[in-house]
Amino acid sequence: YSGFNFLAADHDELWWVSNRAPAPQCLAPGVYGVSNHLLDTPWSKVVRGKRRLGSLLRSAPAVEPLLELLADTSVADEDELPDTGVGPERERLLSALRVVSPAYGTRCSTAVLVGGDGRVQFAERAYGAQGEERDTLRYEFRFSD
């Protein structure tokens, strides 16, 4: 994967940029999804993740349920697989929110919550090559003016 997606935020704005998109984009409030393609590419895992994220955000948002969402290893049904040119078996492997594979897979997942008061909760969970959970780092801080 030679492309990248990058998010930058302060207390007021969230920006997304990719080396595959024509220009940076300031994101309006809402639920977005990103994988190894452009923002909101309608791959099954992006659509599924956005739906679950929206549901989590309607309740009392917390970091742990977000990390659990990102840890989902269920794969898409055959008819929901995209055709990115890697073949059906690989498409199936890559259709999980958390890809488990020794050669190529999810090595960390990050959840960030920003409250209206500027309080930020940041957590990152690391995984080994066999998919085992390694550790979780947690930080809390406030955006300053």
Regions found by a protein language model. Give the residues of each.
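N-terminal nucleophile
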Residues: 1-145
